[in-house]
Curated annotation (Swiss-Prot):
NCBIfam families: mutl (TIGR00585). This is DNA mismatch repair protein MutL. The gene is mutL. The keyword DNA damage applies. PANTHER family: DNA MISMATCH REPAIR PROTEIN MLH, PMS, MUTL, DNA MISMATCH REPAIR PROTEIN MLH1. GO terms for biological process: mismatch repair. GO terms for molecular function: ATP binding; ATP hydrolysis activity; ATP-dependent DNA damage sensor activity; mismatched DNA binding.
Length: 613
């Protein structure tokens, strides 16, 4: 394969036409890029209603009409000139830009690869004026009278007609239309105060009337999202975060329902996406993606939007503080799902006669001291005590097989109001798997293993975060056969194991002895726990397992210890589990994002039995 050689040429300036076409390679990547640039111009012009008409996926025609301020006839030629704009006039304005567009190259770039006609009318003009984008050094753009309502229409036809090589890289009509429609949806989500209409090949595809973000997001993301979303509203100094995040149960197999905006601009920023993903990390499977519509507003001087040709990436002046703010805001919203559904979390109340005591301890911890000092905000999280005992240990549960339906009549529900306890009071245990409880809304079904697993997981996290992992020494050490790798891991990672609450000693080249386990896990299979911990520490390294794999490891430990199916619980034990669920953050989902309980309201039960028909 031989390299091609170019004839020797002297250095010379490029023509305006070629310069614009080179710029178009970055700005006009595909039809959807044209739609994006024109929609942003319409919004910058103050439009409150925008119509988008497409033909053949936008390749044959893209026509966007708005009711914005319009352009005077004297300014129309400048609108098609390269690097001409009304949005900035100095470096200071560029660094504080508040508009979506600012480079002044979009229309010129589009006109260099398509037939473009710009029609505009200001509110005080008697009629509209139009100009056609004519490329070529010997031709001038002429302004002519036209008809039209106040506002602007940009009509782009025959995209890439003069650059056939670019057309070859386009996909099918439906694919290109899909990209265009997604751009319209993104921008429509950012501006619910603006009406949008989208048509393709003469048929109306969608219309979004002026509305609030709740209804606009429900329209675009669908009923699945609107029925499983949490409101998000946080402010810290110059940072304001608002929008909606989906519950883990509304996660998707693809990340196509993730919309993040910075000062009204849709972005795909790695820092922000990582912050949101980290907040979901212990309530969502690794192969699932959360759904959300989040907007971050801040001083334009604190963010640089001029770092990517399509302005889809941004750079923050204090990226660490922004990351921490977004992460903790989303984490708190997810942690308050119970409170969102049922109201305030109940305060500690003495257990009724015959029931086991339960404990709720709240410790205040402040995150990111440097962030607090800079923005004057202190954020707190709640840490809770043990599930059944005040000493932090898990109460042993019955080991005998449970009957298919175990019920009890001496229920505290007879003497206490459901209003104080969102999850109500236990009625029965079903097949040794589910707890049936009654609250003021109707029937509550609890997956007892998933719920208990979540409670233990949160307790283990809190203990590890506070360096307060309580250890239960074993009266008689448990010895087991170990291979060379396990023995080596126990020797090399003793400090890591101790920090996790495990004291594992090497007795011989083939024998390990478990001398202590975490108090929270004292009723689990110690040998199985030890092998799992040794495997993870060996695979990821002692230091990494406590940072990168901490949540996965603690989730495994919690799963081993949580109450299993066919374990019969007494009435007080079931109620104690319900009370601790109410006092535990993120208790609505297990560690894998599945629901731990569901509510069947009285109306739902009426429908099942066709009552009232």
């Amino acid at each position: 394969m031989h390299a091609t050689t170019q004839p020797f040429r002297p250095i010379q300036p490029l023509s305006d036409q070629l310069i614009s076409q080179i710029a178009a390679g970055e700005v006009v990547e595909r039809p959807s890029a044209v739609v994006k640039e024109l929609l942003e111009n319409a919004l910058d012009a103050g439009a409150t209603a925008i119509t988008v008409r497409l033909e053949q996926g936008g390749v044959k025609r893209i026509a966007i009409t708005d009711n914005g301020r319009g352009i005077t006839p004297e300014q129309l030629p400048l609108a098609l000139a390269r690097h001409a704009t009304s949005k900035i006039n100095s470096l200071n304005e560029l660094e504080n830009v508040g508009t979506l567009g600012f480079r002044g190259e979009a229309l010129a770039s589009i006109a260099s690869v398509a037939q473009l006609t710009l029609t505009s009318r200001t509110a005080d003009a008697q009629h509209a004026w139009e100009i056609s984008g004519v490329q070529g050094s010997d031709q001038k753009n002429t302004v002519a009278p036209s008809s039209g309502a106040p506002g602007t229409t940009v009509d782009v036809q025959d995209l890439y007609f003069n650059t056939p090589a670019r057309r070859k890289f386009l996909k099918t009509e439906q694919t290109e239309f899909g990209h265009c429609a997604e751009v319209v949806r993104r921008i429509a989500l950012s501006r619910p105060d603006v009406a949008f209409s989208l048509s393709h090949n003469g048929k109306t595809v969608d219309h979004w009337a002026v509305n609030d973000i709740a209804k606009r997001s429900a329209h675009i993301l669908g009923s699945e999202f609107s029925g499983a979303r949490l409101p998000l509203e946080e402010t810290a100094g110059p940072l304001h975060l608002h929008g909606f995040i989906g519950l883990p149960t509304a996660s998707k197999a693809r990340g196509d329902a993730q919309y993040f905006y910075v000062n009204g601009r849709f972005v795909r920023d790695k820092l922000l996406m990582h912050a949101v993903r980290s907040a979901y990390q212990d309530v969502l499977h690794g192969d699932r993606y959360p759904s959300y519509v989040i907007s971050l507003d801040l001083d334009p001087a604190l963010v640089d939007v001029n770092v990517h040709p399509s302005k889809i990436e941004v750079r923050f002046r204090d990226s660490r503080s922004v990351h921490q703010f977004v992460f903790h805001a989303v984490s708190r919203a997810l942690a308050q799902t119970s409170a969102t559904a049922f109201g305030a979390v109940p305060s500690p109340t003495p257990a009724p006669s015959g029931a086991l005591p339960w404990l709720r301890e709240q410790q205040q911890t402040t995150f990111a001291p440097q962030f607090q000092q800079q923005y004057g905000v202190a954020q707190t999280t709640a840490n809770y005590g043990a599930l059944f005992n005040t000493d932090g240990a898990v109460t042993p549960l019955g080991t005998e097989p449970a009957p298919a339906f175990a019920a009890f009549t001496n229920s505290p529900a007879q003497t206490m109001s459901d209003d104080e306890f969102p999850l109500g009071f236990a009625l029965a245990q079903l097949h040794g798997i589910f707890i049936l409880a009654q609250n003021t809304k109707g029937l509550v079904l609890v997956d007892m293993h998933a719920a208990h697993e979540r409670i233990l997981y949160e307790q283990l996290k809190n203990a590890l975060d506070d360096n307060a992992m309580q250890v239960q020494p074993l009266l008689i050490p448990i010895t087991f056969y170990a291979d060379d790798v396990e023995v080596g891991t126990a020797e090399d990672s003793k400090e890591t194991l101790l920090s996790l609450g495990f004291d594992i000693a090497v007795m011989s080249p083939t024998t390990l002895a478990i001398r202590a386990v975490p108090t929270l896990l004292k009723n689990a299979d110690a040998q199985s726990l030890a092998r799992d911990v040794l495997r993870d520490v060996r695979e990821y390294g002692g230091s990494r397992v406590l940072v990168e794999r901490r949540n996965e490891l603690l989730g495994t430990l919690a799963c081993h210890t949580a109450v299993r199916a066919n374990r019969m619980l007494t009435g007080p034990e079931m109620n104690a589990l319900l009370r601790q669920m109410e006092a535990t953050e993120r208790a609505d989902q297990c560690n894998h994002g599945r629901p731990t309980w569901v509510q069947l309201g009285l109306s739902d039960l009426d429908k099942l039995f066709e009552r009232g028909r």
